């Protein structure tokens, strides 16, 4: 029986590790402050970070706005807690720092104003929800959330 050198043992160990599949990349953390690069006469301009994360998994924390109903498959995530229903207000009262969150499945929503952390796929571009008529520029799809 031939003795195995330390070097051969280390190389064999590293090669065996290389055969394991790599874990899927973790979701990138996004903040409300990083959503937009600028605001001008042409409207909001998405930040380079947002553009780079299009169709990628993200994690973002914020506050669940008062929902339309107690159980739903979507809600609005805001930077700051809202005491009013965003759907019940005029455009003048509509906050700029919001994301629409579409859950992977309908779920009971937490108390309005509760801080939550959302994980899902970032979607960019104008979209009109066929059921609610809600218009959004940024969405998190196939999402889940937990109380922060």
Could you say what each language-model-derived stretch is?
Residues 2, 8-26:
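N-terminal export signals
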Residues 2-3, 54:
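Short N-terminal signal/transit or membrane-insertion segments
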Residues 25-148:
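OB-fold and OB-like single-stranded nucleic-acid-recognition modules
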